[in-house]
Amino acid sequence: MELLCSPTSLSSSFALSSALLVPRSFSMPGTRRFMVLCSSQKESQMTVSVTGATGFIGRRLVQRLRADNHAIRVLTRSKSKAEQIFPAKDFPGIVIAEESEWKNCVQGSTAVVNLAGLPISTRWSPEIKKEIKGSRIRVTSKVVDLINNSPAEARPTVLVSATAVGYYGTSETGVFDENSPSGKDYLAEVCREWEGTALKANKDVRVALIRIGVVLGKDGGALAMMIPFFQMFAGGPLGSGQQWFSWIHVDDLVNLIYEALTNPSYKGVINGTAPNPVRLGEMCQQLGSVLSRPSWLPVPDFALKALLGEGATVVLEGQKVLPVRAKELGFEFKYKYVKDALRAIMQ
């Protein structure tokens, strides 16, 4: 039975039937159905190239793809780091490629997921600001060029590219969905150029742009930096606490990306945020409640600005972003409320 599922099963069916002395036209009850199921299973398997795979989101995505037996090609600038995160014993068959080898990985892939970019939660010097934008544009441009220059028969058919809710600018009163205009600040500019670069992909490639909010998970992102302070009874809101906090649980984001890979209806801009954004003050209260710790020690604006400079904008200002398109597409959020997400993370 295993032979029927092998890569050569269709081309060698005559040899197999001859060896078993079964006429080629003969079919046992249930055999045809079994072969169709095997073929369908094989066709549903993807080969996915991933940039930013060693990051917080990328690691979880690779684990999900691996769990579903898809082939994974990690496009990295540090092969040694990627090999530590994805050891061959735990990820058999994974391909890890440095930049000079990306071409061979992109060609023949079913899809590419582009998550690469320098983290923005740091002090913004002029050099860092240049690299925040440059790292995103450079990698996205390279990926798009490799896709476009692939032979038609080897070209990926899907590009899922990250962008961010920073596209909308910041507001304490506005509500943003996928049709809202772009903001005018630095991060909005970065996102516009980032998205514009991804949209240069070949017209036959389905492009999904995921505008990602604040990703919640225990192993990375904003929450990983906040939890230690709360555990030491030193947690509290940042700044006024009135800024909007458009969040998403990392598992929901990975599921959204996965759906964008497999569902042809997912194209264009899709907000990667939970349906119920909250003010940052409420989020901190919920985190304190889940941890059985008070949320009593606010961090004043001036302290954050002294620490992060212009980069303090990321935490002192926010935007209320709704996932209108994801809901239209029927995407099911596992975590719709921040308290449920925090409870799951801290279990």
From Swiss-Prot:
CDD domains listed in its UniProt record: SDR_a8
Organelle targeting peptide span: 1-37
UniProt keyword list: Chloroplast, Membrane, NADP, Oxidoreductase, Plastid, Plastid inner membrane, Transit peptide
Chief subcellular location: plastid
Listed Gene3D superfamilies: NAD(P)-binding Rossmann-like Domain
Locations listed in the record: Plastid, Chloroplast inner membrane; Plastid, Chloroplast
Pfam families: DUF1731, Epimerase
Gene Ontology biological process terms from the UniProt entry: chloroplast fission
Chloroplast among keywords: yes
Tissue: Expressed in leaves, stems and flower buds.
Its membrane topology: Peripheral membrane protein
A single cellular component GO annotation: chloroplast inner membrane
Enzyme type, top EC level: oxidoreductase
GO molecular function: oxidoreductase activity; protein homodimerization activity
EC number(s) on file: 1.1.1.-
Keyword Plastid: yes
PANTHER family xref list: EPIMERASE FAMILY PROTEIN SDR39U1 (PTHR11092:SF0), SUGAR NUCLEOTIDE EPIMERASE RELATED (PTHR11092)
Assembly and binders: Can form homodimers.
Note: Plants silencing GC1 show greatly enlarged chloroplasts containing densely packed thylakoid membranes in mesophyll cells and leaves with decreased rates of CO(2) assimilation.
Role: Putative NADP-dependent oxidoreductase that acts as a positive regulator of chloroplast division. May play a role at an early stage of the division process.
Designated name of the protein: Epimerase family protein SDR39U1 homolog, chloroplastic
Organism: Arabidopsis thaliana
Gene: GC1
